[in-house]
Amino acid sequence: MPSPRRSMEGRPLGVSASSSSSSPGSPAHGGGGGGSRFEFQSLLSSRATAVDPTCARLRASESPVHRRGSFPLAAAGPSQSPAPPLPEEDRMDLNPSFLGIALRSLLAIDLWLSKKLGVCAGESSSWGSVRPLMKLLEISGHGIPWLLGTLYCLCRSDSWAGREVLMNLLFALLLDLLLVALIKGLVRRRRPAHNQMDMFVTLSVDKYSFPSGHATRAALMSRFILNHLVLAIPLRVLVVLWAFVLGLSRVMLGRHNVTDVAFGFFLGYMQYSIVDYCWLSPHNAPVLFLLWSQR
């Protein structure tokens, strides 16, 4: 049988009023038979003081310590200063730019393709028997034969129109040598590893490969000849074919990478635009033509 309900003082709720008649109006009992009311208020106050776990969690989440993301025990300790940032050179670039990735990929493809096309790089290569012919083609695009040939023709020319064309051809060759030497000295890209340094009459900057001087000269001379010499169509095709094969031979001999030759063609094409814009004539350079005619 259930136990009788007891009050806050431990007495049964059903005791007679005579047992507490010694203090009928006592405040402890609420006075005047209000014992049940006191017991009801006591139960309410005890329930109100109880801790609700849900409310406790909400209050903890709203506390400033929890909002800062640190534990309450750690917040009670001494504050720690943040770690100093790493130096700029020690940081790892985890987000490389698209341009950097594209350039690295292009460089890898360039080196791989140049090595595959270097079939005449040595006598023991797959096309080593064609190497002497490629070296002869190399001489046809060298700067010294072109300079000597232009000077000889300029000295032998007896017409003003011929001298004008040859004077500008000499200007184009000197401009080509100057620009190629300047870019090679600035870029300083080494020649391919499979190249043999047995080239014809090299200078100090010829140990660098970017850009290809033979490619720039081939593009410049072919465009110059096609614009200032009246040639039949087969000869015009032969000039273009010579320029293309000369550039290809630079890769087959292992002298240059593919990008060296490609940029050389572009540079030579643009060099002729400079020469055509600064075209020398007896009208804009009379002193130069007068001095040359007196020789």
UniProtKB/Swiss-Prot annotation:
GO terms for biological process: cholesterol biosynthetic process; farnesyl diphosphate catabolic process; geranyl diphosphate metabolic process; geranylgeranyl diphosphate catabolic process; innate immune response; isoprenoid metabolic process; phospholipid dephosphorylation; positive regulation of neutrophil activation. Residues 249-260 are annotated as: Phosphatase sequence motif III. Residues 16-27 have a biased composition (Low complexity). It is a multi-pass membrane protein. Its main location: endoplasmic reticulum. Keywords: Endoplasmic reticulum, Hydrolase, Immunity, Innate immunity, Lipid metabolism, Lyase, Membrane, Nucleus, Phosphoprotein, Transmembrane, Transmembrane helix. It catalyses: presqualene diphosphate + H2O = presqualene phosphate + phosphate + H(+); presqualene phosphate + H2O = presqualene alcohol + phosphate; (2E,6E)-farnesyl diphosphate + H2O = (2E,6E)-farnesyl phosphate + phosphate + H(+); (2E,6E)-farnesyl phosphate + H2O = (2E,6E)-farnesol + phosphate. Residues 1-132, 186-228, 282-295 are cytoplasmic. The active site is at H214 (proton donors), H256 (nucleophile). Residues 184-192 are annotated as: Phosphatase sequence motif I. GO terms for molecular function: hydrolase activity; isoprenoid diphosphate phosphatase activity; lipid phosphatase activity; lyase activity; lysophosphatidic acid phosphatase activity; phosphatidate phosphatase activity; sphingosine-1-phosphate phosphatase activity. Widely expressed. Expressed in most organs, in particular gastrointestinal organs, spleen, placenta, kidney, thymus and brain. Residues 154-164, 250-260 are lumenal. PANTHER family: POLYISOPRENOID DIPHOSPHATE_PHOSPHATE PHOSPHOHYDROLASE PLPP6 (PTHR14969:SF18), SPHINGOSINE-1-PHOSPHATE PHOSPHOHYDROLASE (PTHR14969). Magnesium-independent polyisoprenoid diphosphatase that catalyzes the sequential dephosphorylation of presqualene, farnesyl, geranyl and geranylgeranyl diphosphates. Functions in the innate immune response through the dephosphorylation of presqualene diphosphate which acts as a potent inhibitor of the signaling pathways contributing to polymorphonuclear neutrophils activation. May regulate the biosynthesis of cholesterol and related sterols by dephosphorylating presqualene and farnesyl diphosphate, two key intermediates in this biosynthetic pathway. This is Polyisoprenoid diphosphate/phosphate phosphohydrolase PLPP6. It comes from Homo sapiens. The gene is PLPP6.
